[in-house]
């Protein structure tokens, strides 16, 4: 297994630091495999296809899509190598730097995968720099009126993408649950969580570029990223989503044989609360939340995407928008962009199963939350939400 660090190093050693570009924060359990036959991705000089010639990827053994960066590779290994070089990523092996890299294990250790890319002859100098972004003019103050805790933006105009992300924000009302300092009971906590989940899906439905994607891609992206989006929404909510009432209720029903399991569960719950609190301490504004959610949503590593390269380009658009926005709005905080981006891998470390068990077990029982999300996404406003809309 590998963990992402920053800077880029060759196959001979690690570099320390942080992931400067955030990457698509690769998931060890998800396959960033090749695009389906017929899908196209941006070509680089030296890319060469051989129609009718069956050649295996020299990195992982999957079916190659042509010659990329000097050798025959599949689309998955091509994209992995391009992403690593463009974003100046490096990785650390958690084993002995000799992990097996094949079609079924290529995503389990990015360090050894990159090492093999170099060993078989992939050339970093063949990777072109990413496209140079052009900021689009937008309204100077595009914060939705009445958004709790959000001040209108001052200074340079924000990009049109950020303006669209802000318009997609549902901003759930706080009045039903009292003020920001209110202590909610367990029923109210579960209800607020349900509304945040619904808001997560509604935000995605109205996020720029998302509605134009095939329905299967929409479902795949949201099923993969819903837990990260939920934590971001929980941190952004006008009413804090505290876990203390749920922990207290869990403690009352914990049997003596479940003590060890309960300790592990509570550690995970504290990790969830810690991520929410860290986002609060960063004082993330609405535009930054929108960009972070878009980066999390458009992950090209989701399985079964019809065009992973297109999804990756959408993620890059959101990342560029965040970079430009932070540089313009917070010129005195040069580390802010890196601190924001580092929140995303940390959010991914909060298990989706924990969020489902903690907040939604009382609501949906054993129904997988991913099934509920799919139904919510495809049904739209006609979805029969248990808590209603009042």
Swiss-Prot record:
UniProt region (Important for dimerization), positions on chain: 314-390
Keyword GTP-binding: no
GTP-binding recorded as keyword: no
Zinc finger (NR C4-type): 57-77, 93-117
Signal peptide region: none
DNA-binding region: 54-129
Subcellular location: Nucleus
GO cellular component: nucleus
Gene3D superfamilies listed in its UniProt record: Erythroid Transcription Factor GATA-1, subunit A, Retinoid X Receptor
Gly residues bias locations: 1-15
GO BP field: cell differentiation; detection of temperature stimulus involved in sensory perception of pain; entrainment of circadian clock by photoperiod; negative regulation of transcription by RNA polymerase II; nervous system development; neuron development
InterPro entries on file: NHR-like_dom_sf (IPR035500), Nucl_hrmn_rcpt_lig-bd (IPR000536), Nuclear_hormone_rcpt_NR2 (IPR050274), Nuclear_hrmn_rcpt (IPR001723), Znf_hrmn_rcpt (IPR001628), Znf_NHR/GATA (IPR013088)
GO molecular function: DNA-binding transcription factor activity; DNA-binding transcription repressor activity, RNA polymerase II-specific; nuclear receptor activity; RNA polymerase II cis-regulatory region sequence-specific DNA binding; sequence-specific DNA binding; sequence-specific double-stranded DNA binding; zinc ion binding
Record-annotated NR LBD domain positions: 157-380
Region: Disordered, residue numbers: 1-50
Organism domain of life: Eukaryota
Pfam families the UniProt entry points to: Hormone_recep, zf-C4
Keywords: DNA-binding, Metal-binding, Nucleus, Phosphoprotein, Receptor, Repressor, Transcription, Transcription regulation, Zinc, Zinc-finger
Phosphoserine carried by residues: 35, 41
Family: Belongs to the nuclear hormone receptor family. NR2 subfamily.
Its job: Transcription factor predominantly involved in transcriptional repression. Binds to promoter/enhancer response elements that contain the imperfect 5'-AGGTCA-3' direct or inverted repeats with various spacings which are also recognized by other nuclear hormone receptors. Involved in modulation of hormonal responses. Represses transcriptional activity of the lutropin-choriogonadotropic hormone receptor/LHCGR gene, the renin/REN gene and the oxytocin-neurophysin/OXT gene.
Subunit structure as annotated in this protein's UniProt entry: Binds DNA as dimer; homodimer and heterodimer with NR2F2 and probably NR2F1. Interacts with THRB.
Protein name, as recorded: Nuclear receptor subfamily 2 group F member 6
Species of the source: Rattus norvegicus (Rat)
Protein encoded by which gene: Nr2f6
